[in-house]
Amino acid sequence: MASKEETPDQEVYAFNADISQLLSLIINAFYSNKEIFLRELISNASDALEKIRYEAIKDPKQIEDQPDYYIRLYADKNNNTLTIEDSGIGMTKADLVNNLGTIAKSGTRAFMEALQAGSDMSMIGQFGVGFYSAYLVADKVTVVSKNNADDQYVWESSASGHFTVKRDDSHEPLKRGTRLILHLKEDQTEYLEERRLKELVKKHSEFISFPISLSVEKTQETEVTDDEAEPEEEKKLEEEDKDKEEKVEDVTDEKVTDVTEEEEKKEEKKKKKRKVTNVTREWEMLNKQKPIWMRLPTEVTNEEYASFYKNLTNDWEDHLAVKHFSVEGQLEFKALLFVPRRAPFDMFESRKKKNNIKLYVRRVFIMDDCEELIPEWLSFVKGVVDSEDLPLNISRETLQQNKILKVIRKNLVKKCLELFNELTEKKEDFKKFYEQFSKNLKLGIHEDNANRSKIAELLRFETTKSGDELVSLKEYVDRMKSDQKFVYYITGESKQSVASSPFLETLKARDYEVLYMTDPIDEYAVQQIKEFEGKKLKCCTKEGLELDEGEDEKKSFEALKEEMEPLCKHIKEVLHDKVEKVVCGTRFTDSPCALVTSEFGWSANMERIMKAQALRDSSITSYMLSKKIMEINPRHSIMKELKARAANDKTDKTVKDLVWLLYDTALLTSGFNLDEPTQFGNRIYRMIKLGLSLDDEEHVEDDSSMPPLDEPVVDSKMEEVD
């Protein structure tokens, strides 16, 4: 027990050593986040009100003297004080002595160690010492408190190592509750401004269960007539009236009219009014927005959800979908999640602060940038989470290790997926959702291993048979051909480019449906989806495309392969290391050839995407850029003619040029970029000359009208053309 001194009217106590050290740390160190003091004190007031409400359930007489529950703020600029008053359970003399100074809370030392280790001051409430945050802005604190079991007492301290307690007869009596009077430091007067106090209550305590009111100045203008304000002038006017009345008796009708007009003017003058300003004070409730997540979903209207969403997000549009739920049992929390109508333009900006989910603990705002609360792929979801189990003011340092938060996160993801599935039942709404947030779903496929199969059910793609409609993987599988083994897909830059790809020729001929994957993120997502409902996904631009063939077809193809073997070798010799090998294939019907990639390497589209990455790892790029495989169509007339010419003369320059031209063209039709566009252009020009029967060695004739290069430019004349 700390030492105690008595004076005739008050008792002086020394702070416990740990508390004294904590106060010294708060007063002498610099903290930028001082505004949290109000959150802590309002939270303490709310706790005190919860306690008396609980006591009143057992014994209604506890609230006979003061049946109202309230928290009130009063800023006194004249005395530089901020008062926070509540009608909670109040404190006895013993409570004031023990709770506010002589008995250290178990968390006092732990909080000091956390502060010295660099933690945020906003953690103070987590350790049960939130009251002392008052000294962040005040150099003296006065606590007036009245408990039903004791008289009214006042506690006071300037945090100078001691505090005083005495029976209170100098302050306005409390029926029950506590009144904190903060004597603000000279540089903290911003907390006397109505605007600032409203801002802090809205930010941190808007959803406290009890009404929070602020004493505000109200200016009212009233109209006062001049005759009320200036009685002397009125008397003078009356005397003038009397004199004129005596003269009126002898005047003509015309003069009577003149006098009447004069009287009207005079009457108007008499009734002339002016405005007087009166300043009054009244209580303005600050937390009018009730926490609708505390109500049952069946009790909340669509209009209330829309109003709350706009207030929460400052969005000018209504939300697209909402999920309102609560989790009870070993863990309790309530949540309200919204899907907006459109994605923010900077949704995937890496440096953007994620602040879409606001975290509350027992209606007290904690933070709005808790990245551990929801995965990145769901960062577009907006809403609130209110936990009954998390410690108040949980720190960022302990978030990642907090098991409660991990359970909340898991439930939020589950409920989001339920919400998205509900949206699929509304075709137009889901179409809007998918247009805006399909990239997020695909990012979820890439990142969320636990929910990958559920997210895959939400994916939609255009196909060779769907026209402009989007098709789900389930719909695709349900209408697969009986002899079809795989889910076929093709990746590319656009629907137009993939729709005319040579890789689709045989698949279309067999009436197999192919998925178009034209979003760059599709390349990453599809690598994680190995199969769907037991059907493996197969890229039709990579080697290993297996198609069911009859025995006769197989024998016929084997004969063609053997026949084309010399041409394959010759093409490989010409192209050298540009291709890994040259093979005969069955995937083409109309095209002579194309370039395929290895099954585990990058596709042409992925290669294009990765080359566009400015900060890519070049070592990985070279590893994944596996050699291309040239696959030729042995049934195509070009290949047959080329085989015949190569057989006649392997040194034929035209054959060599044609091989290179086929390779370059195959690069383009297969989705790759040209390695040497200039060489490709030269080959095209030679083919044009050949088609025009021009000599390949022919040079452009000299133009005699062209001045020599060594002549001055000014001497040359340009012919004028009309």
From Swiss-Prot:
It comes from the Eukaryota. SUPFAM superfamilies: ATPase domain of HSP90 chaperone/DNA topoisomerase II/histidine kinase, HSP90 C-terminal domain, Ribosomal protein S5 domain 2-like. The keyword ATP-binding applies. CDD domains: HATPase_Hsp90-like. Keywords: ATP-binding, Chaperone, Cytoplasm, Nucleotide-binding, Stress response. Residues 233-258 have a biased composition (Basic and acidic residues). Residues 223-232 have a biased composition (Acidic residues). Residues 219-273, 698-722 are annotated as: Disordered. GO terms for cellular component: cytoplasm. A motif (TPR repeat-binding) lies at residues 718-722. Disulfide bonds: none annotated. ATP binds at residues 44, 86, 105, 131, 396. InterPro entries: HATPase_C_sf, Heat_shock_protein_90_CS, HSP90_C, Hsp90_fam, Hsp90_N, Ribosomal_Su5_D2-typ_SF. Belongs to the heat shock protein 90 family. Homodimer. The TPR repeat-binding motif mediates interaction with TPR repeat-containing proteins. Molecular chaperone that promotes the maturation, structural maintenance and proper regulation of specific target proteins involved for instance in cell cycle control and signal transduction. Undergoes a functional cycle that is linked to its ATPase activity. This cycle probably induces conformational changes in the client proteins, thereby causing their activation. Interacts dynamically with various co-chaperones that modulate its substrate recognition, ATPase cycle and chaperone function. This is Heat shock protein 90.
